[in-house]
Amino acid sequence: MAPDTHPGQSASANVYDAVEYPGFAYAHTHPDQLAVMALLYGLDPPPVETCRVLEVACNEGANLIPMAYTIPGAKFVGFDIAPECVARGQEHINALGLKNIRLFAADMLNVGPELGQFDYIIAHGLYAWVPEPVRDRALALCGELLKPNGVAFVSYNALPGSHLRQM
């Protein structure tokens, strides 16, 4: 059985497309927030106005699209293993006429340096529910793709707070 499928599902089908996972904009992942946190810890973060941001497992881009809309001088890249989610996100990007954002479908285990380097890398939520090889790869991508003064945001959803969004 392919790692992205469940019993009874074909290898070409993707469980992340089969079960809808709604996306949201998360203010605490915004480059403005990440830059301020970095400053508070004595770091010298990259300027937000011209930053390059990667979101790992971006779903349909609901977190990245508002950032791209409000920071036109920055560049945004997101990928997700679910092609249908990425396609929905691309429809929103096209409708808004955004030119500073790119979404694509990819397995995290198969991406790397070809993406370039980033000032900010976001891996929100996924770390809590993906298998160990994917968690390891998420951290490795931060090491490979983060610029020297870059900031990585890796969150871990834990009970009981992680179920608040279901209320």
Q: Where does each model-flagged region fall?
A:
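Conserved SAM/SAH-binding beta-strand->alpha-helix loop
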Residues: A82-E84
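A short glycine-rich, Lys/Arg-flanked "PGG" loop and its adjoining helix->strand segment in the class I
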Residues: D136-P148
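Conserved SAM-binding strand-loop segment of SAM-dependent methyltransferases
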Residues: G97-M108
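Conserved SAM-binding motif I beta-strand of class I
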Residues: K75-D80
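Conserved SAM-binding loop of SAM-dependent methyltransferases across substrates and taxa
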Residues: E60-G73
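Conserved class I S-adenosyl-L-methionine
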Residues: V151-M167
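A short acidic, Gly/Pro-enriched loop at the edge of an enzyme's catalytic core
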Residues: G112-I121
